């Protein structure tokens, strides 16, 4: 498995803006727009992910709304693979599978078109999002992929917020790769 060195990780981490107390006091927000706006860092990241996934024999890459769309679609372009969106409720126009997950105060839901994987049984799918925190969205997305008859071969995140344990929960279901462990 191809992973970055500590020096390479620092290079990418330094390209992400840190904003304390956003969106509310006590939260440290990691703003990826500065990475997206840095062509050298962005191309370095995409080259790394292309190298990592080029031999995975993937059929599709699924990205979760909304920042997961950004990275998933760019990886799709690098690997010449189709993109599958996993969206918030009511945003997809055709028949969907849905999966509900718990939030700190309440619940939310994600949806996937029933024919997203073109009825290819056991299609090999890479799940992509910008970060994993508690794991709720990622686990629900994994379950949607399974519900649609495909296989999530790995979940890839730009950042893993280690203290929130989401990656550990998801690793019970599928392989997890995080470019940056925070």
Swiss-Prot record:
Its main location: cytoplasm. It is found in: Cytoplasm. Keywords: Cytoplasm, Glycosyltransferase, Purine salvage, Transferase. Its EC number is 2.4.2.7. Pathway: Purine metabolism; AMP biosynthesis via salvage pathway; AMP from adenine: step 1/1. One of its GO terms (molecular function) is adenine binding. Catalyzes a salvage reaction resulting in the formation of AMP, that is energically less costly than de novo synthesis. Belongs to the purine/pyrimidine phosphoribosyltransferase family. This is Adenine phosphoribosyltransferase. It comes from Campylobacter jejuni subsp. jejuni serotype O:23/36 (strain 81-176).
